[in-house]
């Protein structure tokens, strides 16, 4: 997790890769500068917590770790994905991907998009914030955020598609795909729960254990893959 800091208004946003970060950055820079910003990725996004965190209202945008890894796997490791070149095996399955992930050496699995949300610049002192809100990316309270800034977020920002979204395909799969080569199901709608048998669920839970604990403390129950 990194932080977008509005020092003037004492508001910060916590973001992590594959947790709607492009969407959140667009919102933040509009609210901070009162204009739509087309440049949303850069060094200015990777901040630590402010030293006077107790004066800040903090908004964290999170994602179910079970869903986040599936989303990253399908987006970044598809045949044309930006990190597929890191994969050294002849075939790619979700089960094998998780195996490489939990090894933790980050040779074949790109770290920034798959490290736990409670790593990078995450700091437990965030709990000292004057006020802290944590929203799942599917359930962001935009009204609350607009009220903090006393401004309406344009629909062009709220509805903008960033290009990483999965398409809605004409056919769906409702059986386990964890041991299948990705190309066998990529062009189908596949629910996140279809990627998990009990063994994989336990491996992913243990790897992202601190995420599950932290978000549970903030009222989000991520103990099962999406349905």
Give the role of each language-model region.
Residues 1-227:
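Membrane-interface amphipathic segments in extracytoplasmic regions
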């Amino acid at each position: 997790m990194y932080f977008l800091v509005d020092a003037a208004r004492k508001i910060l946003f916590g973001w992590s890769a594959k947790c709607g970060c492009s969407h959140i950055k667009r919102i933040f820079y509009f609210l901070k500068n009162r204009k739509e910003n087309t440049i949303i990725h850069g060094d200015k996004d990777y901040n630590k917590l402010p030293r006077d965190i107790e004066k800040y209202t903090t908004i964290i945008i999170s994602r179910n770790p079970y869903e986040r890894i599936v989303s990253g796997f399908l987006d970044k490791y598809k045949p044309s994905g930006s990190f597929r070149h890191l994969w050294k095996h002849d075939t790619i399955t979700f089960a094998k991907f998780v195996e490489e992930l939990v090894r933790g050496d980050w040779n074949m699995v790109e770290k920034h998009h798959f490290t736990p949300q409670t790593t990078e610049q995450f700091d437990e002192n965030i709990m000292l914030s004057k006020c802290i809100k944590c929203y799942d990316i599917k359930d962001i309270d935009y009204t609350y955020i607009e009220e903090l800034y006393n401004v309406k977020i344009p629909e062009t920002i709220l509805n903008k598609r960033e290009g990483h979204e999965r398409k809605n395909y004409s056919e769906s799969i409702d059986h386990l795909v964890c041991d299948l080569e990705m190309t066998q199901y990529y062009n189908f709608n596949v629910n996140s729960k279809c990627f998990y048998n009990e063994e994989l669920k336990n491996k992913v839970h243990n790897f992202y254990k601190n995420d599950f604990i932290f978000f549970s403390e903030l009222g989000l129950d991520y103990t099962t893959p999406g349905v």
